[in-house]
Amino acid sequence: MTPALPTTTTQVQQGRLGRLVVARLKPNEDVIDSAEALCASHGIACAVVRGGLGSLIDGELRYHGEHGHQAIHVPGPGIEILSLSGEVIAGRSHLQAVLADADGKLFAGCLQRGRNLSFITVELTLQEWLPD
């Protein structure tokens, strides 16, 4: 018997894109916390992550697998961010990433809040989302 897939809720929202914020994180800054702080400092309630790159001390991801939520620890230092996308909303941000370790092994999942600290630098591009 095939296990039942989790029920998901999809929300469709109309709106438009607003201001663009491009920022460089300093060492030891968490990606999610920093993205939320950047938005707050510019009066942005919701933003789309247009991109991100840089390196993390360690990578901490999660994904929903066959047996519920699974964690992935990517030991560093020097974990490279190859892809970063998602949405930034104060306290509810959801960022998906593809990371590579020093051997080039790839890992994908959702960043865990407070556990993905910039190593040397991380660059983020965020764009304001203005719902109708």
Name what the model sees in each region:
Residues M1-G51, L56-H94, V98-D132:
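N-terminal intrinsically disordered, cationic/polar leader segments
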